[in-house]
Amino acid sequence: MNVNLKRSTIDPRMSRTLPFQRSPQATRARLGKAQLLPIPRAVADELALAAHMSLAALRSGSSDIAPARHITEAMYLAKFLAEAGHGDFSHDELLQADRTMGAVFDTGHACGSWSLPADDFDRLAAIVSLYDHQLRRASLGALSVASERLERFKAGEPYQPMQARKSAPL
């Protein structure tokens, strides 16, 4: 069956194109603009809650390595975001936190329980709080760059501090 529509039979109030039928350039521009916005609040809340729960698990002791891995990842993401201008996180603080987490992993592998010594809790709690704040403020683009950097670091690329940008107001 061949249907031949004349221009006069189409309602002019109807949309001529569907919203997703755009040129590749327009799609890239729209995606580029999305990179400038923060992630949705619900996503930020979920990620922050997971970090806080992992910290609580380490505080009370965990039979699973996952909370220690999660806190270590959050620690590096917070550092990478701070280097991009989202908060303050000194290199010395990173070194101290890294030593703390190294001890958590060593002890956990030796005895099967991953726990955070009480003396080190406040240091990591401050980092998790910074990460929580960064998730609510940093753009999707900054979070994507930090995540890509974390994946390269986990794959074996050595950590190299970026020239820190001036911190955005918190």
Give names to the regions the model predicted:
Residues 9, 49, 163-166:
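Intrinsically disordered, low-complexity segments enriched in glycine/proline and serine/threonine
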Residues 56-72, 109-126:
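Short, low-complexity cationic-aromatic patches
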Residues 19-84:
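Short terminal alpha-helical segments
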Residues 30, 46, 50, 54, ...:
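Charge-rich, solvent-exposed alpha-helical interaction surfaces
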Residues 70-103, 133-148:
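Extended intrinsically disordered, low-complexity coil regions enriched in Ser, Thr, Gly, Ala
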